[in-house]
Design a protein with these regions (language model features):
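Short, exposed beta-strand/loop patches in secreted or surface proteins that constitute
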Residues: 56-58, 131-135, 169
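Short, well-structured beta-strand
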Residues: 138-207
C-alpha cells in the first residue's frame, strides 16, 4: 500500500495489454487497456495478482488503486478513503461469502506487512468482514456493500471500513472487473461521491 515499498519481480502474460511474458511488471509504467481516472492529487499504485501479502486469494490479474489526497491524514474525512480495481483474468464468480473471505485474507496480510507485530501484539485482533448484496447498479452484474473491522496500522487503533463493491464484465473481453470503494465515513459523506465517480467514469477499453 501507499508509503510502503512493494518490490515485485514477477511475470505476467497479458493478452489484452500485449505485455511479453519475459518483461518485468512495472506498476508505474503499466498502461491499462481500460479507463480508470487518474485524478490530480490522488496517488496511484498498481501491482500483480496473486497478491504478495494475500497469496490465498486465487485470482490472476492486476490491482489498480486510487488513494484520496487525505488517505493518511486522520483529521480529514478522506482518511483511509480509497478505491481499487481488480482486473482479473477469466470469468470469476463472486458472492457475499467469497468476498468476505477475500477481504479477510487481504486485510490480514496488509496489516502484517505494514506492522511490527512484536510492538503491537497487545493490539492485534482478527480481521472481520461482513458483506451483503445491495441493489444492482447500472452496468454491474452484482453490487455489494458491507464492512471490514481491523487494526488500523497507522493509528494502532481499531477501525471499521465501509465498502461498496461492483462486479462487471465487458463484451468481447475474457476479464472480470471488481471495483472496491472504501472509507470509514458513513455513506452519506461526500467522500463517497468522489470514490463512486471513478466507477461512473470507468470504461472497459480506451477506444
Amino acid at each position: 500500500m501507499k508509503n510502503i515499498l512493494f518490490i515485485v519481480v514477477l511475470f505476467l502474460f497479458l493478452k489484452s495489454s500485449g505485455q511479453n511474458v519475459n518483461e518485468e511488471f512495472d506498476g508505474k509504467k503499466c498502461e491499462a487497456p481500460y479507463v480508470l481516472d487518474t485524478i490530480k492529487g490522488w496517488d496511484v499504485e498498481r501491482f500483480l495478482i496473486p497478491i504478495s501479502f494475500a497469496p490465498s486469494i486465487p485470482y490472476k490479474g492486476i490491482e489498480d488503486i486510487r488513494f484520496t489526497p487525505g488517505w493518511a491524514k486522520k483529521t480529514t474525512n478522506e482518511y483511509w478513503s480509497y478505491a481499487f480495481l481488480w482486473y482479473l483474468d477469466g470469468t470469476v464468480t463472486l458472492d457475499a461469502r467469497t468476498i468476505e473471505n477475500n477481504l479477510k485474507a487481504y486485510y490480514t496480510g496488509l496489516i502484517k506487512v505494514n506492522s511490527d507485530s512484536s510492538k503491537i501484539a497487545d493490539k492485534l485482533f482478527p480481521v472481520t468482514s461482513s458483506i451483503k448484496p445491495r441493489t444492482t447498479e447500472k452496468e454491474d452484474l452484482k453490487t455489494f456493500e458491507g464492512s471490514v473491522t481491523m487494526l488500523d496500522y497507522m493509528s494502532k487503533q481499531a477501525i471499521t471500513l465501509n465498502l461498496v463493491i461492483h462486479i462487471r464484465t465487458c463484451a468481447g473481453k475474457d476479464k472480470t472487473f471488481v471495483f472496491h470503494e472504501i472509507s470509514p465515513m458513513p455513506y452519506p459523506d461526500d467522500v463517497w461521491k468522489r470514490l463512486h465517480q471513478l466507477w461512473v467514469n470507468f470504461k472497459c477499453d480506451k477506444k
